[in-house]
Design a protein with these regions (language model features):
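Periplasmic/extracellular loop-to-transmembrane helix junction in inner-membrane transport proteins
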Residues: 1-38, 85
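Loop-to-helix entry region at the N-terminal start of transmembrane alpha-helices
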Residues: 22-33, 80-108, 148, 192, ...
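Short helix-to-coil transition segments within interhelical loops
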Residues: 117-147, 175
């Protein structure tokens, strides 16, 4: 109970909410890192996943590289990127952390996008070709709607990983919630360490919840039970 009181007192301290090293500043930095990293990962990984998923070409190499990337520990990625960024005069903090987080987000998006498209029934795709659909139409009107659930699951995984791992940026002076853990360790402040870990965990869980809700809204029950091609054959408007 005494520790819980210290934790509450830490959060209630006005100093934690104002100034350069306040919670709002580091939360904003954390959100900026994760947001830019996820967008960067999508820009790179989504086209790769769509191409190899739709055509099947280069899939073995791309998926093998993605799996290798997933096997590398997050701190190791940061350890690889940081000295390179110093050599290139990219500095400390935001940019090297962002590059590492983008690299971390790519593998789950690539693998899930590929799997989402390859899991679409081939008979459904061939039926679309028989109806005169081009490759782009097949991708956007058949494969993507049917595989959207698995694709979004990959984005969801990447988002949660990025949010949780962004805290490591504090090691190289990036503004993020990990600052409170690092600073707490340096000053032997157990409530601060626990507060930082609590905020990081809470933000990760919130990200998981938001993407779960997004999946439910985007993948409607009707879309899950009725394929786009079936709706077209039935003459349902909007196809």
């Amino acid at each position: 109970m005494e520790f819980l009181g210290q934790l509450v007192a830490w959060f209630a301290d006005p100093e934690q909410w104002t100034g350069h090293n306040s919670i709002p500043i580091h939360l904003a930095g954390h959100l900026a890192l994760t947001g830019f990293a996820l967008v960067g990962g999508l820009v790179i990984a989504l086209p790769i996943g769509l191409v190899i998923g739709h055509t099947g070409r280069g899939a073995f190499l791309a998926i093998a590289l993605a799996n290798v990337g997933r096997a590398i520990p997050s701190i190791a990625i940061l350890g690889i990127v940081f000295p390179i960024s110093l050599r290139l005069d990219l500095g400390f903090g935001f940019l090297p952390t962002l590059i590492a987080l983008i690299a971390l987000s790519i593998p789950p998006i690539v693998t899930n996008t590929y799997a989402a498209l390859r899991e679409v029934d081939r008979d459904l795709v061939e039926a679309g070709r028989g109806m005169g659909m081009g490759e782009l139409q097949l991708l956007t009107r058949v494969e993507l709607p049917v595989g959207a659930g698995l694709l979004l699951a990959g984005v969801r995984t990447a988002a949660v990983q990025v949010v949780a791992t962004a805290s490591l940026g504090a090691v190289i002076s990036a503004d993020c919630l990990g600052y409170f853990v690092i600073h707490g360790i340096a000053t032997h402040d157990l409530p601060e360490i626990f507060a930082g870990a609590l905020m990081i965990s809470g933000l990760s869980l919130l990200t998981e919840l938001l993407f779960a809700l997004l999946q439910r809204r985007v993948i409607s029950p009707g879309l899950q039970t009725t394929t786009p091609l079936a709706r077209a054959e039935a003459g349902i408007p909007g196809f």
